[in-house]
Amino acid sequence: MVRITMEDGGIIDIELNEEVAPITCENFKKLVKEGFRGPIYCTKSTEELCSILLPDSAHIQEGEAEYANRKGMRAGKKIVEPLFTVDDAARALHLFKLRSFGEAFNVVPGVTVTFRVAGHILGSAFVEMSVNEGDKKTRLIFTGDIGQPNQPIIEDPAVAGGADFIITESTYGNRIHEAYDKEGELANIINDTVERGGNVIIPAFAVGRTQVLLYYFQKLQAEGKIPEIPIYVDSPMANRATQITMTNPEEYDEEARALYAMQGRRLVSMHNLRFTATVQESMAINEIPGSKIVISASGMADAGRILHHLKHNLWREDSSIVFAGYQAEGTIGRRLIEGIKRIKIMGEDIRVNAKIYNMKGFSAHADKQQLLAWYSSMKEVPKAFFVTHGELDAAMELADSLGRNLGTATYIPHFGDCAEIHGTEWQMHESEMVQVEPAAIDLRAYMRGMEHDYLLQRSKIEQIVARNPDKAVMVRKKLEKLHKYMDDILKDL
C-alpha cells in the first residue's frame, strides 16, 4: 500500500499487486466488497486471467459458507458470510482498466506508473512509480514476483533503469535453483512409465505450470524423445488459462514467437492433445486403455479433478505421479513426496504403489543469485531496499546479500511499519493506518528488547570464542539446547 499526502492535505491510497494469483484476487474482491470503486489497472492478459480466477474463487467461498451454515445451524451457531461473492467478483472486474507494458500513465496528478515485464507468469509486471511532490521527486520500484530467466513461452524480466527505493520480493531469497536437465528427466519418466504400461499423472497449477508442461511435451515429441501417447488437460480452469496463453503472443519470448508463426499462429499444436470439459469426460479418461499423460489441478493435489486420477492410479505399480511445483506442508502432494505409504483420497484408503517424482526445476521464481544479478544490472543503486514477500529467513539472507553486494541500506518491514519518504529521504515509524491492540504493542516492544539483548550476547560470544576457540563446541551445544527449548515452548502457539 502506498499512501500519498497531497499539498492540500488530501490523502490518496494506492494498492499495488503485480500479477494474478489467488491471494491477489482475494485482495481485489475484499477491497470491492468493502466499498472500493476506483480503477484497477492491469495488463491485458492479467485481466483475462482474473476473469476466470475471480469468479471461481468467489464461487468456492460461497460454497464453503453454505456448507458451514448447514452444519452451524444445527449446532445453533451464527450465520457465516462468505468473504466475497460472485457479485463482488463481477463488480471488481468492471473496475479493471487495461494498460500495456512500457506505457506510462497517471494514476493521480503527480503520480506516474509504468508496467514492466516481470517474467514470472503471463501478464505479471513489476511496477515503476514516479511521485512528484512540489520540487521533490521520488522513484520507486515494486517488484512483485520476479521470474526465473530462460523460462519457456514468456520473456525474461525486463531490465529496470533504477529507482530511489525498491520494494523487493524475497520468495527464494535464500535458495539457489538446481541446474539439471529437466527435459531429459521428464522424458525418462514418461518413457519408463509407458514401458511399464502405466499412466503419467501430473498435478499442476492451472496458470503457468500447465502451459509450460504442454510446451515441453510438444518439444520432446517433435524431437522424437517421447512417444505420441494421449495427453489430457483435465481442468476447466487450466483449459481456459491455456486458451488465454495461446491468444497473447505479444508476451512470448523469441523462441515461442517463432514457433507460433511456424505452426500457423498456434503455440501448441499436438494431434494427441485433448482438453476435457465435463465431469463425464473427466471420469471417462480412466476407462481408456493404454498409457496416457493426465495434467490436472490442483497443483498440490488437495482438491479438484486430480483427486479422481490419483484414486485410480496411486495403487498401480506401473503408473507415475509427477509433481512439478511447490508442495505446502500438510497437503496431499507434500505427504506423497515425503513417502507416505497409504493415503485417504475421496473417502477411500489407498496404498501408494505408483512411483512418485518431485521435479524441482520448474519454479517460475527467480532465486537468490538471479535476483542479485537482476539488481546488479540496474544503472543506479537505490537508497534502500525494503525486503518483503518471503519467509523471514529468506528475507534476512537476501537483505544481507543486497547490503554486502550493492552497498546500500536494507530494511525488512514488520507488521504495522510505515516508511515515510520525502524525495530521497526516508524514515520508519509505526503506521496510523493499522489498528494494533495495546497488548500487541507491548509484546512488540518486548521482542525488540530481546533482539537487542541477543545482539549483545552474540557480540560477547564471538569475542569469547575469538580469544578461546576451544570453547566454540561447548557454546554451540548450549545454544542448541536453548534453541530446542524455545521451539518446544512456542510450538503450540
Regions found by a protein language model. Give the residues of each.
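Start-of-domain signal
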Residues: 1-32
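Gly/Ser/Thr-rich loops at beta-strand to alpha-helix junctions
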Residues: 6, 121-122, 205-212, 299-303, ...
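Short, surface-exposed connector motifs at secondary-structure boundaries
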Residues: 9-11, 35-36, 192-201, 227, ...
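His/Asp/Glu-rich metal-coordinating catalytic cores
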Residues: 35-212, 216-234, 251-258
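Short, charged, surface-exposed secondary-structure boundary motifs
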Residues: 50-52, 151-152, 176-178, 241-243, ...
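Acidic/glycine-enriched edge-of-secondary-structure segments
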Residues: 137-143, 149, 169-177, 203-204, ...
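C-terminal regulatory/interaction regions
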Residues: 219-222, 269-493
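Long, charge-dense
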Residues: 233-252, 415-428
